[in-house]
Each structure stands twice: as C-alpha cells, then as structure tokens.
Amino acid sequence: MTIAVGKFTKDEKDLFDSMDDWLRRDRFVFVGWSGLLLFPCAYFALGGWFTGTTFVTSWYTHGLASSYLEGCNFLTAAVSTPANSLAHSLLLLWGPEAQGDFTRWCQLGGLWAFVALHGAFALIGFMLRQFELARSVQLRPYNAIAFSGPIAVFVSVFLIYPLGQSGWFFAPSFGVAAIFRFILFFQGFHNWTLNPFHMMGVAGVLGAALLCAIHGATVENTLFEDGDGANTFRAFNPTQAEETYSMVTANRFWSQIFGVAFSNKRWLHFFMLFVPVTGLWMSALGVVGLALNLRAYDFVSQEIRAAEDPEFETFYTKNILLNEGIRAWMAAQDQPHENLIFPEEVLPRGNAL
C-alpha cells in the first residue's frame, strides 16, 4: 500500500477558488466572505433608516409625526415600530398585510422590521469580518469576541424583548428621542435602574471609560523620549522594535497611588477587554429577563411602611411613585389603541402632595 504525503493541489481553479481569490484580495477596503453578508445588510439597514426618517409618518402606528417631511429634526425623527395589532409579523412587503403595496407597507411599520432585521445581520456580518481578517493576518479573534457585546445588546433590546411582549410595537423605534422614550418606558414598567443586570451593565460601561482614561493618560505619561519629539505623533513609527512606553515606571506610579497595580500588559489589557464586554453581556441578559417580565429588586417592607406612615419616605418609595406616574401617564399616550383613560384622582401623588 502506498501512502502519499504532501499537499493536494488542484489542476485548475473552480468557481469557489475564483470567488475566494476575488473576495479576499488585498485592496483598500477588504471585502471577504463576510462582506457578502455585511455590505448588503448594512446598505439596506441604513438606506431604510434614512428613507423612513425622511419621508415616512408614524401616524398610523403611533399617532405621531416622525419624519423630516412632517417637520421633525434629527433628534425627533424616527423609524417607528409597527402597530401593536400586527403582533410579531415579519411584515414582508409581499405578505398578507401590505400585499405588495409599498406605501401601505411603510404606513404599517414595515420599514422598522426591515431595518431591525437587516441591522442585526449587518452587525453579525461585521463580527464575522473581524474573525475573517484576524484569521487572514494570524491574529487572535478577541476583537470579534468583544464585538459580541454590542450585538448581544442590540438583539436583546430590539428583537428578544418585543418577542417576549405582545408585539414589535414595544421595541424601541430607531430615533434619538424615540430611544429616550423607550428608556422611560423601561424605567416605569420594569423599574430597570434597580435591576442588578442594569447595575452590572453601568459598572461595565463606566468602568471601561475610567480604565480607558487611566490607561491612555498613563501611556502618555511614560513615553520613552527616544525620538525627535516626546509625543505620540512625532517620536515613534509603526514598525519600531522598541517599546513605546515604560511599563515598569507605570507600575511603580500606580503602586504608589493605589498600593496595587497591574504587573504585566497581558493582564492589564485583558481586564480592559473583560470589563466592558461583560457589562454589555450582563445588561443583555437583563433585557432578556425583562422580555419575560422578571422583576427587579422589590423592597416591600419599605413600601408597606410608607403606605402606613405618611411621614416615612425613602428614595426607593419615591422612585416607585415616579414609576407609577410614568405608567399612568405613559400608557394612555403610548398605547392610544387601548383607549386607556385614568381619572385625575387615581393618578399617583407623592406623600408630600
């Protein structure tokens, strides 16, 4: 028996090889196989958003004006979610709702579903792009792993949360003021700021900002003066073999400041990766919990005492009253299809009123 050892080579290129050569060619903007997903989806998502914010009203779904054409500006324009009556329909242009009528499709909120789904696939394509490029230049894939944090947040907020509710209607609309309204909704209906997963998310994002500021300042403070100018832009070149800054000096400085400091760059930079990504993952998990209507912390003893004693209030009980006010005022305005009417005497008032 003969065993052939060596690399198998094909005599001629097939279609796959030709596509692989073209897609992964070294050019100014790398395309790659991931680009087949990223570029079309990003193009359609952005195009749908610009189209919706420019021309499409939300009168039929939310009773609102939401386009530049109706007088909105960049902060108030939005691509709004479909009507609550449409539940979780994919709202395909050729589906039973729009029946191929583009104008009707826009009026029903079809652009939101279009932007949300293409946006999610575009983000996934961007993560795959980082995997593909890292493999091509023989890097570790930590950039792609880090980008899973924003993807988890986007998918949980825009897709999983409304899937757990009665319809896409309860997802955020794509606009600045619309996102602010959604945040108020989250606070009023889910007490989101007292949710431990939100707390971990805030700690991760703000902690990452602090770490970035400290790290950047420390590197700038400990640059080696081995060029014609001791600053980032003049003294060093991207192909130098020497270190740019002194880790030893930085370690000594922070050891004196805090009593402890990072002793090597690997642990330091892994920590800078770990803090924000874990925070984003935790907040995404929290939103998945909200999709199932899981509750935040409840301090029932304080609520009972506040109900019995008009002079007893804590910041917690005041916030609970605020949440009740958000629900009472927001539900009627935010869900006009429900025809909710709250008499003045049932609207919540603080103990001081």
From Swiss-Prot:
Q: Where are the transmembrane segments?
A: 41-61, 125-141, 153-166, 208-228, 279-295
Q: Give residue numbers for the modification (N-acetylthreonine).
A: T2
Q: Which residues take part in binding pheophytin a? A: Q130, N143
**Domain of life, per the record?**
Eukaryota
Q: Which residues bind a plastoquinone?
A: H215, F262
Q: Where in the cell is it found?
A: Plastid, Chloroplast thylakoid membrane
Positions of chlorophyll a PD2 binding: H198
Keywords, in A-Z order: Acetylation, Chlorophyll, Chloroplast, Chromophore, Electron transport, Iron, Magnesium, Membrane, Metal-binding, Oxidoreductase, Phosphoprotein, Photosynthesis, Photosystem II, Plastid, Thylakoid, Transmembrane, Transmembrane helix, Transport
What InterPro entries does the annotation carry? D1/D2, Photo_II_D1/D2_sf, Photo_RC_L/M, Photo_RC_L/M_CS, PSII_PsbD/D2
The catalysed reaction is: 2 a plastoquinone + 4 hnu + 2 H2O = 2 a plastoquinol + O2
Question: How is the cofactor bound, as the UniProt entry phrases it?
Answer: The D1/D2 heterodimer binds P680, chlorophylls that are the primary electron donor of PSII, and subsequent electron acceptors. It shares a non-heme iron and each subunit binds pheophytin, quinone, additional chlorophylls, carotenoids and lipids. There is also a Cl(-1) ion associated with D1 and D2, which is required for oxygen evolution. The PSII complex binds additional chlorophylls, carotenoids and specific lipids.
For binding Fe cation, which residues are annotated in this chain's numbering?
A: H215, H269
Q: Which residues bind chlorophyll a ChlzD2?
A: H118
User: What are its GO cellular component terms?
Assistant: chloroplast thylakoid membrane; photosystem II
Q: Which GO terms describe its biological process?
A: photosynthetic electron transport in photosystem II
What kind of membrane protein is this, topologically?
A: Multi-pass membrane protein
- For the protein in the UniProt heading, the enzyme class is oxidoreductase
Question: What EC number(s) would the UniProt record show?
Answer: 1.10.3.9
Q: What Pfam family is a match, any one?
A: Photo_RC
- Supply the HAMAP family for this chain: PSII_PsbD_D2
This molecule's function is given as: Photosystem II (PSII) is a light-driven water:plastoquinone oxidoreductase that uses light energy to abstract electrons from H(2)O, generating O(2) and a proton gradient subsequently used for ATP formation. It consists of a core antenna complex that captures photons, and an electron transfer chain that converts photonic excitation into a charge separation. The D1/D2 (PsbA/PsbD) reaction center heterodimer binds P680, the primary electron donor of PSII as well as several subsequent electron acceptors. D2 is needed for assembly of a stable PSII complex.
Q: Describe its partners and assembly state.
A: PSII is composed of 1 copy each of membrane proteins PsbA, PsbB, PsbC, PsbD, PsbE, PsbF, PsbH, PsbI, PsbJ, PsbK, PsbL, PsbM, PsbT, PsbX, PsbY, PsbZ, Psb30/Ycf12, at least 3 peripheral proteins of the oxygen-evolving complex and a large number of cofactors. It forms dimeric complexes.
Q: What else is known?
A: 2 of the reaction center chlorophylls (ChlD1 and ChlD2) are entirely coordinated by water.
Please give the family membership noted in the entry. Answer: Belongs to the reaction center PufL/M/PsbA/D family.
The family database entries (NCBIfam families) matched by this protein are listed as: psbD (TIGR01152)
Report what the protein is called: Photosystem II D2 protein
Native organism taxonomy: Eukaryota, Viridiplantae, Streptophyta, Embryophyta, Tracheophyta
